[in-house]
Amino acid sequence: MVEKRFPAAGRDAMAYVLAGGRGSRLKELTDRRAKPAVYFGGKTRIIDFALSNALNSGIRRIGVATQYKAHSLIRHMQRGWNFFRPERNESFDILPASQRVSETQWYEGTADAVYQNIDIIEPYGPEYMVILAGDHIYKMDYEWMLQQHVDSGADVTIGCLEVPRMEAVGFGVMHVDDKDRIIDFVEKPADPPGIPGNPDFALASMGIYVFHTKFLIECLKRDAADPNSSRDFGKDIIPHIVKNGKAVAHRFTQSCVRSDFEREAYWRDVGTIDAYWQANIDLTAVVPELDIYDKSWPIWTYAEISPPAKFVHDDEDRRGSAVSSVVAGDCIISGASLYNSLLFTGVRANSYSKLEGAVVLPSVKVGRRAQLKNVVIDHGVTIPEGLVVGEDPELDAKRWRRTESGICLITQSMIDKLDL
């Protein structure tokens, strides 16, 4: 874990989490919930990582902007993030789109989602604003980024990842000088600029920005008055500052939080079914790339009161077992076998069923003799007895949402259409 060597800037900052996006590439997983509300890691939701990073970084004022199908996200935060105390100068504001500046205008972009709540932000008087995306998996101490922002005198400091240059085509990319001052910002370039001294890599935006609050509000008001703006940080606010002010890149390797078991700086955009499945399955490794057991940097969440997991039956062909798997509380593995799988709370896996490479969301019931391989099963699904998934690619593609790599997303509506 990184060690602080400077006065805490987090106490003078407010974190503002942008959590209104659908995440359409997750397909049916976001039919009923926003991407930040999607379950991750057996216990948490995706948004818990950005919120936990802020809390662990010493930030005690947090706002969360919501929009698309926000009920489950809001309910989760009301239950799990309701411990902030105003008498300690703490606050946690949930800010759903509510036409606050116009009777016809919802949040029209990421910048607009902050602009419409300026009157809520200003009374708190934060000196700095830390703008965060609420849909990524990573551990980061924002104090280091705040301190760089203060020391550099930048108008904006942007969190960046070093990625192979040809993988940067899907990101906003920073063209920097040898002191990491940003001299150009290009959104999803066909030919990303390389890093000085390391031309095979590019600096990709993490969607994390630090501003002085007064300067940010000036930028948002100017942008709101521009009829040609799309009201977006990446498309409008940041390019304007790069051109007319001082923008500095902050490299994730300088502030990522790693335990003794984590070798690399871990950041994932779990925005596709394949990426979501892989990031969850990664947690079943003996030494996972992401250490969610690090008590010095806990991932806070809402946890239901539930009994422990239970494994029953010990016959030769009917043994409740789990190998290289993560199993949450209130699961009953009744004569089923799990391998390289991750189960959320309340799953029931019945006799003779076999799960391999399965990511199983809460309250799923797996019928007897089901054979499930390389699947993501949505919340509350009932798997019929004897169902086989992962053996016949053509049949799977007809029944489920099957990716090119062979991962099948299964929802209850898909099950209901089966003619078994």
From Swiss-Prot:
Its recorded reaction(s) are: alpha-D-glucose 1-phosphate + ATP + H(+) = ADP-alpha-D-glucose + diphosphate
Pathway per the UniProt entry: Glycan biosynthesis; glycogen biosynthesis
Keyword terms? ATP-binding, Carbohydrate metabolism, Glycogen biosynthesis, Glycogen metabolism, Nucleotide-binding, Nucleotidyltransferase, Transferase
Question: Is Zinc-finger given among the entry's keywords?
Answer: no
The record lists its disulfide bonds as none
One BP annotation, GO: glycogen biosynthetic process
Under the heading InterPro entries, the entry gives:
ADP-Glc_PPase, ADP_Glu_pyroP_CS, GlgC_bac, GlmU/GlgC-like_hexapep, NTP_transferase_dom, Nucleotide-diphossugar_trans, Trimer_LpxA-like_sf
Enzyme group, top EC level? transferase
Q: What Enzyme Commission number(s) apply to this enzyme?
A: 2.7.7.27
The residues listed in the UniProt record as binding alpha-D-glucose 1-phosphate, with positions renumbered to this chain, are 107, 172, 187-188, 205
Record has Nucleotidyltransferase as a keyword: yes
The record's GO molecular-function terms, alphabetically, read:
ATP binding; glucose-1-phosphate adenylyltransferase activity
Q: How does it assemble?
A: Homotetramer.
What the protein does comes down to:
Involved in the biosynthesis of ADP-glucose, a building block required for the elongation reactions to produce glycogen. Catalyzes the reaction between ATP and alpha-D-glucose 1-phosphate (G1P) to produce pyrophosphate and ADP-Glc.
What PANTHER family does UniProt report for this protein, alphabetically?
A: GLUCOSE-1-PHOSPHATE ADENYLYLTRANSFERASE (PTHR43523:SF2), GLUCOSE-1-PHOSPHATE ADENYLYLTRANSFERASE-RELATED (PTHR43523)
Similarity remark: Belongs to the bacterial/plant glucose-1-phosphate adenylyltransferase family.
Name it.
Glucose-1-phosphate adenylyltransferase
Species annotation: Rhizobium tropici
